[in-house]
């Protein structure tokens, strides 16, 4: 278990996140740092158990839609929000795939004149408080979904030497982007999903009329169009009843989807410790301090919660200081709370 109280991070701007993380990865679940956990595409449900009470940032990226020979599928969307969680809570994570996993539409029964086959809408990525599998299974339990990033729409099919299929719409974001037309009057692009409208909850449309591309998965999936147009991207979603500071963006993710969870703890010290701690087996250290005119917080007993790790319980706090750093973790400090 990680340090329960000693976390300090900075939250960087959405634009920086979006640009820095526009990459593709097929890696399985990994732990990126002591205060963050990352999840990549696996084709199934993954889970994360909250290690300690506190506030966390949830970030999700949807998958890119499939490419045609001449045009690209829409990039996956992005969403983020903050949530207070308790130790032992479990969140369930599903990462969208470029193969349509988690709601992307399919077009496996068609191919273009160049042999391009199997264009899919990108799958959505979501985090929920229960395990019901793919997003579409929450249609009667939407309140259990915390956050969604839409998948990009698939490109329309091309015709050799004559027509080029339209590009896929970007994944959401509040709304998914519309697909692109192939330029003919009767080419109708697929519409992107919205907050309360789209092809279907959790699912993008499969192949539309006359070689149109499929829709991306999302809160509401993108629609397919007509005559080689691109499919619409799926919409994203932030559950504002449970998350704060929500934000979404369109079209920032190449390849499969992605999820990152970051601890947002920040702790400061308000008083000096004037006695060395006494260690106890249960991991609680107790401090006392004497009152003074310059240290109003003194006169109380302080306790320090020691994480269940192999830290040396004999390490003492230097007298007259505000505490000591976590062994081997410069810049990270144990937090003391007034009892």
Pin down the residues of each PLM region.
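Bacterial N-terminal signal peptides that target proteins for export
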Residues: 1-13
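Extracellular modular ligand-binding repeats in secreted and cell-surface proteins
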Residues: 264-339
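GGW-centered surface loops in extracellular recognition modules
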Residues: 33-67, 140-141
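Short tyrosine-centred short linear motifs in exposed loops/low-complexity segments
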Residues: 41-46, 52-56, 89, 280-283, ...
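Sec-dependent signal peptide cleavage junction
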Residues: 21-34
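Bacterial N-terminal signal peptides
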Residues: 12-24
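Secretome/extracellular-domain signature
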Residues: 73-178
């Amino acid at each position: 278990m990680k340090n329960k109280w000693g976390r300090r991070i900075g939250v960087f701007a959405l634009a920086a996140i979006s640009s820095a993380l526009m990459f593709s990865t097929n890696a399985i679940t990994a732990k990126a740092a002591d205060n963050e956990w990352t999840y990549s595409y696996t084709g199934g449900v993954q889970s994360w158990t909250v290690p300690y009470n506190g506030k966390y940032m949830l970030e999700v990226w949807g998958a890119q839609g499939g490419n045609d020979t001449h045009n690209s599928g829409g990039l996956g969307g992005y969403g983020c929000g903050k949530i207070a969680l308790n130790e032992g809570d479990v969140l369930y994570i599903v990462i969208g795939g470029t193969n349509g996993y988690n709601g992307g539409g399919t077009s496996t029964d068609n191919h273009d004149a160049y042999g391009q086959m199997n264009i899919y809408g990108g799958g959505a990525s979501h985090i929920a408080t229960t395990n019901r599998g793919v997003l579409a299974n929450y249609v009667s339990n939407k309140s259990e979904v915390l956050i969604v990033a839409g998948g990009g729409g698939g490109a329309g099919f091309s015709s050799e030497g004559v027509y080029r299929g339209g590009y896929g719409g970007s994944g959401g974001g509040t709304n998914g982007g519309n697909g692109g037309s192939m330029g003919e009057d009767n080419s109708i692009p697929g519409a992107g999903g919205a907050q309360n409208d789209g092809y279907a909850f959790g699912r993008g449309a499969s192949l539309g009329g006359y070689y149109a591309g499929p829709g991306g998965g999302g809160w509401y999936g993108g629609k397919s169009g007509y005559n080689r147009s691109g499919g619409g991207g799926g919409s994203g979603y932030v559950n504002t009843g449970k998350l704060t500071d929500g934000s979404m963006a369109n079209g920032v993710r190449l390849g499969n989807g992605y999820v990152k969870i970051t601890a947002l703890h920040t702790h400061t010290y308000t008083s000096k410790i004037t006695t060395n701690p006494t260690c106890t087996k249960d991991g609680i250290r107790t401090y006392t301090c004497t009152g003074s005119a310059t240290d109003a917080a003194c006169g109380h007993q302080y306790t320090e919660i020691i994480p269940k790790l192999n830290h040396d319980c004999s390490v003492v706090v230097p007298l007259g200081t505000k505490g000591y750093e976590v062994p081997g973790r410069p810049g990270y400090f144990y937090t003391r709370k007034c009892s």
